[in-house]
Design a protein with these regions (language model features):
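Glycine-rich beta-strand-centered segment in the early N-terminal region that forms part
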Residues: 41-58, 72-119, 135
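NAD(P)H dinucleotide-binding glycine-rich loop of Rossmann-like/cofactor-binding domains
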Residues: 78-81, 90, 117-195, 326
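Short internal alpha-helix immediately C-terminal to a glycine-rich phosphate-binding loop
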Residues: 145-147, 171-218, 330-350, 356, ...
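Adenosine-nucleotide cofactor-binding segment
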Residues: 195-206, 211-283, 333-334, 340, ...
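Rossmann-fold NAD(P)-binding glycine/threonine-rich loop
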Residues: 281-289, 300-321
Length: 419
C-alpha cells in the first residue's frame, strides 16, 4: 500500500499532537505564536463529537478581512482573541477519524466530509466555522453539537457526506462554489413584511399620484414622515380596514433620522423603508442605516440624487438587506421576484468586475457553462497577468459553448467598456 492509500485509509498511527495556526489578535503577526504554529494534544471525542482530520483548506478574501479586523469582525462579536483565540479556514475537506458513542449510527471512520460553514445557533446568531467556531488551519480537531446539532432547532447538521473520488483540494472548494451558486438564488425578502414595521419618508409638496397596488395590508406599524397627502390618504384608508398603528414624525432633519430607531422593536430597525422622490444622497445614506436585518429599502422616484450614497455593503452580505426601486407611481412595483431577477439573463450580456480573481474566475466559468445563460461574457480586471490566465483558461470553454468572451482591462484600454 502506497503512502497516499495509507493516508486515505487511516492505517497510519494517530499522532499524539497536532499543529494548529491559532489566531490570537488582528494582523498577520497574530496568526500563530511568534509566526509559528502551535502544538496541541490530539483530543478524544466525547459521545456527541467526531475527531476529524483536515485534508485540505482553501483561503478566502474573507480571511483577509478577519485578519485585518480581528475581534472587531462582525462574526467575532468583539471577542478578545488573546484570551479566546479562533482559527481561520472555513473552506475545508475532512475525514472522520474517531466517532463518539452517540454518533456511530450516523458517521464512521474514514468517512469523508465537507462543511457548510455558515452556522447559526439556537438564537439565530451566526456562529460560523472559521470565525466564531475555530476553523480548519489545524491537522486534527473535534466537531461537536456546535456543528452537528446547531441552528434555531438545534437539529441542523452542517457537515455533508462526500461520496466518490473527488480530490481533497477540489472538495475544499465546495464552499466557494456554493457561494457562487447562491449569488444567483434569491435569499432576500422581496415584499413588505406581514406584521412588520414600515417607514415611509417623503416630502409634502411631491405631486406624484402615488398608488400602492399591493403590500400596504401587511405592516402592523406604519411611520409616516413628511409624506405627500396622496400617500397619507392611502395609509389612513388602510387603517380604516384593519388594526394598524400609525405614527407621524414630520420635519425631520438628516441628523434626526437616527432617532426613529426608537420606534422599532428593540431598536432593530425598520423591516421596510420607502423613500419617495429622494434627492439627498446624505439623507438616503442616513435612512439606509435604519434597515433591519433582512429588511427592504425602496427608492421611488425619477430624479438623480445629488451625490453618492454611503451604503454598508457588508450588511447586504451578512444581513441580507435588499435595495429596490422604481420610477413610480406604483410604490409596490419595486417588489417581487419578477422585477428583482437573480439569475443571468438568457442570451444577454454579463459583465464581471474583478473577474481575474479566484471567485471572479468561478463566476465567469459558470456563466460560460450555463445552458440558458448569457451570450456575451465580459471579464474585466486591472491585473494584466490575471486576465491573461483567464483568457487562456476560458477562451476555449467559451468557444465550446458558443459564447463570446470579451477580456477588458480598463487601465490599458483606450476606450471605455461602454464605447
Amino acid at each position: 500500500m502506497g503512502s497516499f492509500e495509507r493516508y486515505r485509509s487511516l492505517t497510519a498511527p494517530l499522532p499524539a499532537q497536532t499543529w494548529a495556526w491559532n489566531m490570537v489578535g488582528a494582523g498577520v503577526e497574530n496568526i500563530g505564536r511568534g509566526g509559528k504554529p502551535e502544538l496541541e494534544p490530539v483530543p478524544t471525542p466525547g459521545p456527541n463529537q467526531l475527531l476529524v482530520r483536515v485534508d485540505a483548506v482553501g483561503m478566502c478574501f474573507s480571511d483577509v478581512k478577519l485578519i485585518k479586523q480581528g475581534g472587531q469582525h462582525p462574526k467575532l462579536y468583539n471577542r478578545d482573541l488573546s484570551l479566546y483565540p479562533t482559527r481561520l479556514g472555513h473552506e475545508v475537506a475532512m475525514t472522520v477519524v474517531q466517532v463518539g458513542a452517540a454518533l456511530q449510527d450516523r458517521f464512521y471512520p474514514a468517512q469523508r466530509l465537507v462543511l457548510q460553514p455558515d452556522i447559526y445557533d439556537a438564537q439565530g446568531r451566526s456562529t460560523a466555522y472559521g470565525y466564531t467556531i475555530p476553523g480548519g488551519l489545524i491537522q486534527f480537531h473535534l466537531v461537536g453539537p456546535e456543528v452537528l446539532a446547531a441552528g434555531p432547532d438545534q437539529q441542523t447538521c452542517y457537515v455533508l457526506p462526500l461520496e466518490g473520488d473527488l480530490g481533497y483540494a477540489a472538495a475544499a472548494l465546495t464552499e466557494p462554489w456554493a457561494c457562487v451558486e447562491a449569488a444567483y438564488t434569491q435569499r432576500r425578502r422581496l415584499e413588505i413584511l406581514k406584521g412588520g414595521s414600515l417607514w415611509i419618508w417623503g416630502h409634502p409638496d411631491d405631486p406624484t399620484p402615488y398608488i400602492f397596488s399591493a403590500g400596504l395590508e401587511n405592516p402592523a406599524r406604519i411611520v409616516l414622515s413628511d409624506v405627500p397627502p396622496a400617500v397619507e390618504a392611502l395609509v389612513r384608508a388602510e387603517a380604516r380596514r384593519r388594526p394598524v398603528e400609525i405614527i407621524e414624525r414630520n420635519g425631520l432633519t438628516v441628523e434626526a433620522l437616527a432617532d426613529l430607531r426608537a420606534l422599532t422593536d428593540g431598536g432593530a430597525g425598520f423591516d421596510d423603508i420607502i423613500v419617495l422622490d429622494p434627492r439627498s444622497a446624505e439623507g438616503v445614506s442616513a435612512a439606509a442605516r435604519l434597515i433591519a436585518r433582512r429588511g427592504t429599502f425602496n427608492l421611488v422616484g425619477q430624479t438623480p440624487l445629488d451625490g453618492l450614497c454611503q451604503v454598508d455593503v457588508g450588511r447586504i452580505h451578512y444581513d441580507y438587506t435588499a435595495y429596490l426601486g422604481n420610477r413610480g407611481p406604483d410604490i409596490a412595483a419595486s417588489y417581487g421576484k419578477a422585477r428583482n431577477r437573480c439569475e443571468l439573463r438568457t442570451g444577454g450580456t454579463a459583465v464581471f468586475v474583478g473577474a481575474g480573481g479566484p471567485m471572479g474566475q468561478m463566476h465567469v466559468q459558470r456563466a460560460l457553462e450555463l445552458p440558458e445563460g448569457p451570450a456575451v461574457v465580459v471579464a474585466t480586471d486591472v491585473n494584466a497577468g490575471r486576465l491573461a490566465i483567464l483568457e487562456a483558461q476560458f477562451a476555449p470553454l467559451a468557444a465550446q459553448h458558443g459564447k463570446t468572451l470579451v477580456i477588458f482591462n480598463p487601465n490599458a484600454a483606450e476606450k471605455s467598456l461602454a464605447e
